[in-house]
């Protein structure tokens, strides 16, 4: 969309489009998670926060500025992104059991089915085109394109023989609830998130590095419900809509750089881990 806005002609090639993508499943909130290098992701994330904050004031974007509570079992230093978010404060009282500290702040929640629909309409209105197809590699692309932007995510591991790419398996539960505040425990060993949206609440989660399994796990389901209800007890009896599973596109560091492959100028843009909408 930014390329179209700046006068470029753009064609997207993809094997799948919404609603059949990993992005459609994502809980999707602004929060730097499983991404590096921090000195770059903090800058990118700061810019994204401002964009999402502006989008929250527009109709049909699916972006909502949401009061958020992040809980810790040990005392923490202030996060590097403290100055980016609205209304940041640290609390040490009135916390769920076993937690000793809480960061309270306002951050965007992005309801991905709505946001992807809004992006598609914006893209179409600017004259962008779509092609549903796959590519075996980057060596034999048509000469009709001046620049190729590689956003193939997890598939970059195969297409580019990139050994730094790995899956981070996630599983969530959608439940019915009227909650309006978000609750998080973003430590990998106790990962928990309760993300309110317009018609449901997303409960998570897991972040299983190197796990390619796309089957739903009963053990993960039970663990998610236990962790979330330990923070918000009424979720124990919430009506369950469905369970979903997908793979985050992990990498040791985000790859954003230019490379010449054959006669093509390729801009690599992948490895965003659990920070897709944040970056």
Set out the residue ranges of the language-model regions:
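A conserved short coil-to-beta-strand element within the FAD-binding core of flavoproteins
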Residues: 128-143
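C-terminal catalytic lobe of FAD-dependent flavoproteins
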Residues: 118, 238-279
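Short beta-strand to alpha-helix junction loop
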Residues: 37-47, 102-118, 215-220, 273-279
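Glycine-rich FAD pyrophosphate-binding loop
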Residues: 5-24
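Glycine-/small-residue-rich beta->alpha transition segments that form the dinucleotide
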Residues: 145-147, 151-157
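Central beta-strand plus flanking loop segment that forms part of the substrate or channel wall
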Residues: 27-32, 66-72, 157-186, 225-236
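Flavin (FAD/FMN) cofactor-binding and adjacent substrate-gating region
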Residues: 47-126, 251
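Flavin-binding catalytic cores
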Residues: 54, 165, 179-181, 198-202, ...
